[in-house]
Amino acid sequence: MEAKKLWGGRFEASLEEWVEEFGASIRFDQKLAKYDIQGSLAHVKMLGQTRIISQAEAQVIQAGLEELLEEYEAGKLVFDIRNEDIHMNIESLLTEKIGSVAGKLHTARSRNDQVATDMHLYLKDTLFQVVDKLTNLRQILVDLAQEHVETIMPGYTHLQHAQPISFAQHLLAYYNMFSRDSERFAFNMQHTNVSPLGAAALAGTTFPIDRQMTSDLMGFAKPYSNSLDAVSDRDFILEFLSNASILMMHMSRLCEEIINWCSYEYQFVTLSDTFSTGSSIMPQKKNPDMAELIRGKTGRVYGNLVGLLTVMKSLPLTYNKDLQEDKEGMFDTAETVLISIDILAGMLKTMTVHKERMAQSTEKDFSNATELADYLASKGLPFRQAHEIVGKLVLECSKAGHYLQDVSFETYQAISPLIQADIYDALSSKVAVSRRNSLGGTGFESIADQLKSAKEEIQNAKSL
């Protein structure tokens, strides 16, 4: 039996089946079922309170919706593609349950404000989850940094050894990135926590609705102040996709480093077996597949952002069917981000850090060259002159196959009488790191200050 279209009064002919399938969205927008029912519950309570429909009718509709919500949460609802989308599927199921009175639910409402409301509710839930998971990830980074304040590793520029740094500082750099991500998602909430319900198709309604009431019932901060904006706004989704893209970029950067660190050439870390895979042909392989997948999925999230920006770029006010394309990218991004945060957190929490290997990699390089230049500058030599002297010495050492700490004291004295026997302490990677205590620097005192601030920030985040 063909499902009757709720909008069918205007039409003499029905859609062909293949056209209907092209236009239907129930395949993916069924993810909004819970939120669609929640929005309808708020709407029908308001309709009853304002006497737009009778209290008795409102109670019957409310009871039917509550039954549908229970059935949905139990996985018992079955949706029909002939009902196009989640809104018409829910209304059809409600009609089967309580009869024609279900038709009064849509009084003073359009699918335009209905779908916008559903997406605001969905994204609110998602934002809370993302921020909560980011707080956990930041906590793991802080805990790991606390363990490795005095773990020395090479700091890189251009992927070349630059200066020795504390591994804790490297981790805290990512902590800061994820903190900014949390702030962006929190700000995103301001534009998401607004109710479109009651805007109707675009121009509002002649019924004496109470939009503040429905907004409050759904837990929104306020209703939209302009009905045209309410049904056509997708900025809140674009902000989410943009913020998610930046977050994925940060996670991808860290994953790239983890991939390098667990390679044979680095051997800085070993990933847990629970976050690694093997090879079907090479029995020795232990591959960082999960880190690689996060890196790969980053491009997918970027694509979702560009996709929706492109959909929106020429849309006139207000609702256009193009906006059906706003959902799949949002759902995909939300699911990708949430699982990626969990995977990265798990990798960091279970990986083994090889402190000795990290430290050794700073001993057979020239990353202490800046220390020698700074040493000479601290003795009164102009830094540019010191830079020139050290550069030439590095060249000579490179040709001779040894390092700055191998140069004899006599040779140093010949280079400059300003150089004293304490030069060898200054060239030590650990000493070099410990002394850089400028604000935000890699020195141990500076790291302690950074950790203190980070712990306070996390405590505040957990108390919200």
Swiss-Prot record:
Its EC number is 4.3.2.1. It is found in: Cytoplasm. Keywords: Amino-acid biosynthesis, Arginine biosynthesis, Cytoplasm, Lyase. It is an enzyme of class 4 (lyase). InterPro entries: Arg_succ_lyase_C (IPR029419), Argininosuccinate_lyase (IPR009049), Fumarase/histidase_N (IPR024083), Fumarate_lyase_CS (IPR020557), Fumarate_lyase_fam (IPR000362), Fumarate_lyase_N (IPR022761), L-Aspartase-like (IPR008948). GO terms for biological process: arginine biosynthetic process via ornithine; L-arginine biosynthetic process. The keyword Lyase applies. This is Argininosuccinate lyase. It comes from Streptococcus suis (strain 05ZYH33). The gene is argH.
